């Protein structure tokens, strides 16, 4: 028997229909098929969170074209593919929320586990967000961005041992590495009706690391 994921249990508890799909968002055809499946199984899409991401620990002079493309294909190209695919439905509905995940690395220039490819791709997400907000505004669609600091996720490459967390936390005013719940709370707000007059914004979620 398969154990339900936490998201599945939450959906059942609130009687929310769900559909889980594993998709390579760097593949335009796969994105189109996945969104089509969601559209046929669930109510119209009026909220999109672009959260997929990959990093790179490679120093700039050692970055190959393949490595550069690998990072941009997911972090920026994938964000473009998914957003472009779902935007028409939001326009038709006359309402929408688009939130993309950038990174503090886009603002500070790398650090932690990320280097130039990751920082550049996440900076592109911020520019994408601001430009798209201009075009989507007349359709009552908000477009925002969150820029997390160090978060305990798989993108850190399994390097966040308790010892490393403690070392990283020393530079964070709030004294700890972030959790996925810290980011999810902001994403949830930006998807809500309460955020209807917020667009083209980038929010730091880093425990104050931007001032250290």
Please report, for each region that a protein language model flagged, where it lies by residue:
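Residue(s) in the substrate-gating loop at a strand-loop-helix junction
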Residues: 103
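Alpha-helical segment proximal to the catalytic Tyr-Lys
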Residues: 88, 130, 134-135, 196
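Short, small/polar-rich loop/turn modules that mediate ligand/substrate recognition or access, typified
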Residues: 137, 142, 198-200
